[in-house]
């Protein structure tokens, strides 16, 4: 028996309730290795392992990693023999790859029962097993059903549950043996496929990697340990299992002891050494119970390996105890993180599911209300947008902010057009004065010159105003389209109908807005301002136009140029500046008003009314609410994930800890 410190306390043989290479030997069931393996864990072990097994059965592993022990090894490393010794059942054996699917081996110790029970689960199949001899056959059937009858492999799990008073409380994941060369009907890239499957499991930080290595090979060259070191370079979550110590060449036993004592290739969790049934033992029909007794005798009598037994590093019972202890410690360590991950995933999926909404009702009456809700939500988003109250991301700007920026640019364009250099204005006025001044004496303002200049300057602003209209219209159309996508993306016909309305209304209102803008500029060709308004503006210009500023205006001109500028030109300039102030105020405000009215207010209102008109034709409800093919599948997928995680949260909440 093995005590809690892993030492041998007596030499009683282990029970004889084992398989004899597919046959059952029921001669002795009075005491089993499991009786001594988990005595200190009776209240803690099973609940911990059951919790993780139940989460795995729920499919939570599809969403996040669960604590596990994964068993890996090269072909012919003795991996199957180790698992047989732990479980008491024969697993598939033979040449080539015999483990073709990941096998979740759930061992459950029965305290007050003697009856052996087994269950194989895969896909939608669940097979109860009453005799251990049936396990190998059922596992092979499951692998053929999942991976085909050839030599291919699959990532899909097979679950084998063994309940017996003679097994430890333990869950292991057996992975295919590592192969290098395709044999027989195996795919040419079987080596790559196998390593890819193994790496998928051992890469996870939640997995303890159980690496099986024969004693009679150089440990540094084994592929399994090399793969484990790639994903766990510090050896924090790797346990080495040394097998076949009876095949070690004479004189090399000391090297094996050094490896087992963690002196060669260091692993923080260390090494164990076991001697399981070999092929000859199987042919001689040596039972697993007999094999365990022979293993114990082997280590007790071996001059080199006896020390490993004394240190608790040898035999299958000690291995079972260590694995159970490591798994429980690992589960307890990862539970808080697991609980947080499940909570975060639950919240994330809940939020994602909201984007897909609820299922479309089958009842026509309910379908109408469903469509009304959809249209109202869309119209509310449009209202928020045109009122400048829509929700945006941290690094995003509201539509109205973007439009306001365009209006600021428009004001800058006006200033740039009006504020030409004084020298250029004087030259322009001089040209008009020479061309249009008639019989007036110097000092009399030529109104024609003033009128032509101001009309020309205002006319130059018309096309920039129309360009601004097109820019803002495109911005609004994109924003409306984004709202349509956010609300109706899963309903292809409704989304397409909405986009069509957005485009049609845009085309109509953009034409109306452009017509209004051009009409405004036509009216601006009438030079007009209220008398009292103009007089105040002219007075401000004249007060500002001091002698010093006049000097600055003409300082860049030559003496000849200054002498050619007469009093009438100065007078025209003052009138131009005065009128420009009032024209600037009108144009800089009125053009944005036109755009806001047509491209925000009317556009939004017409779109909202157009969407509500869809309710008038009841025959189109089903057509409008026809979902994209992937939408319902995605919603179903998210609901299933949410249900899994919700169940997982409830089970974690009930766990005593």
UniProtKB/Swiss-Prot annotation:
Molecular function in Gene Ontology: GTP binding; GTPase activity
Stretch list, region G5 motif: 275-278
UniProt region (Critical for lipid-binding), positions on chain: 550-553
Domain GED, residue spans: 569-657
Membrane topology field: Peripheral membrane protein
PTM remark: ISGylated.
Region: G3 motif, residue numbers: 174-177
Region (Bundle signaling element (BSE)): 337-362
SMART domains per UniProt: DYNc, GED
Record remark on domains: The C-terminal GTPase effector domain (GED) is involved in oligomerization and viral target recognition.
Protein name: Interferon-induced GTP-binding protein Mx1
Organism whose genome encodes this protein: Canis lupus familiaris (Dog)
């Amino acid at each position: 028996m093995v005590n809690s410190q892993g030492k041998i306390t007596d030499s009683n043989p282990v029970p004889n309730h084992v398989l004899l290479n597919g046959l059952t030997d029921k001669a002795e069931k009075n005491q089993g290795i499991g009786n001594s393996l988990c005595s200190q864990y009776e209240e803690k072990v099973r609940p911990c392992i059951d919790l993780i097994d139940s989460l795995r059965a729920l499919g939570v592993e599809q969403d996040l990693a669960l604590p596990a022990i994964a068993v890996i090894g090269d072909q012919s490393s003795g991996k199957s023999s180790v698992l047989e010794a732990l479980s008491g059942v024969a697993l598939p054996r033979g040449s080539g790859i015999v483990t073709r699917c990941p096998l979740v081996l759930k061992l459950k110790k029965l305290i007050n029962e003697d009856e052996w029970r087994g269950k194989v689960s895969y896909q939608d199949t669940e097979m109860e097993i009453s005799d251990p001899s049936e396990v190998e056959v059922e596992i092979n059937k499951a692998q053929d059903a999942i991976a085909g009858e050839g030599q291919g492999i699959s990532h899909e799990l097979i679950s084998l549950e063994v309940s017996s008073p003679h097994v430890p409380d333990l869950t292991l994941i057996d992975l295919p043996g590592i192969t290098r060369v395709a044999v027989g009907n195996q795919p040419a890239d079987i080596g790559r496929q196998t390593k890819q499957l193994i790496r998928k499991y051992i890469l996870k930080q939640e997995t303890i990697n159980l690496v099986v290595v024969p004693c009679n090979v150089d440990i540094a060259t084994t592929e399994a340990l090399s793969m484990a070191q790639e994903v766990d370079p510090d050896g924090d979550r790797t346990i080495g299992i040394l097998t076949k110590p009876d095949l070690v060449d004479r004189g090399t036993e000391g090297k094996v002891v050094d490896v087992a004592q963690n002196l060669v290739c260091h692993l923080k969790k260390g090494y164990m050494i076991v001697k399981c049934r070999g092929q000859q033992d199987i042919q001689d029909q040596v039972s697993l119970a007999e094999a365990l007794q022979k293993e114990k005798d082997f280590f007790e009598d071996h001059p080199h390996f006896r020390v490993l037994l004394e240190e608790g590093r040898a035999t299958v019972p000690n291995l079972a105890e260590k694995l159970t202890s490591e798994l429980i410690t690992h589960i307890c360590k990862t539970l808080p993180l697991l609980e947080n991950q499940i909570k975060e995933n639950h919240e994330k999926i809940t939020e994602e599911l909201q984007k897909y909404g609820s299922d479309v009702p089958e009842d026509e009456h309910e379908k109408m209300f469903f469509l009304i809700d959809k249209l109202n939500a869309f119209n509310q988003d449009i209202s928020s947008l045109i009122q400048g109250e829509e929700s945006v991301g941290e690094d995003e700007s509201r539509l109205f902010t973007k439009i306001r920026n365009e209006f600021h640019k428009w004001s800058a364009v006006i200033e740039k057009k009006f504020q030409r250099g004084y020298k250029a204005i004087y030259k322009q006025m001089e040209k008009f004065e020479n061309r249009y001044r008639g019989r007036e004496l110097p000092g009399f303002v030529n109104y024609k010159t003033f009128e032509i200049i101001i009309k020309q300057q205002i006319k130059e602003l018309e096309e920039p105003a129309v360009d601004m209209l097109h820019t803002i219209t495109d911005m609004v159309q994109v924003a409306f389209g984004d709202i349509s996508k956010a609300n109706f993306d899963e309903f292809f016909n409704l989304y397409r109908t909405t986009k069509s309305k957005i485009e049609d209304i845009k085309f109509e209102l953009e034409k109306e807005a452009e017509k209004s803008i051009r009409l405004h500029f036509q009216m601006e060709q009438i030079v007009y301002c209220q008398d009292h308004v103009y007089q105040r503006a002219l007075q401000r210009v004249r007060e500002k136009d001091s002698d010093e500023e006049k000097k600055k205006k003409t300082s860049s001109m030559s003496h000849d140029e200054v002498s050619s500028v007469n009093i009438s030109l100065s007078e025209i300039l003052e009138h131009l500046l005065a009128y420009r102030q009032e024209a600037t105020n009108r144009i800089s405000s009125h053009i944005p008003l036109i755009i806001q009215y047509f491209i925000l207010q009317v556009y939004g209102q017409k779109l909202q009314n157009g969407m509500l008109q869809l309710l008038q034709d009841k025959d189109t409800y089903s057509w409008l609410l026809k979902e994209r093919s992937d939408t319902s599948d995605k919603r179903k997928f998210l609901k299933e994930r949410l249900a899994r995680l919700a169940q997982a949260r409830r089970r974690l909440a009930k766990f005593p800890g």
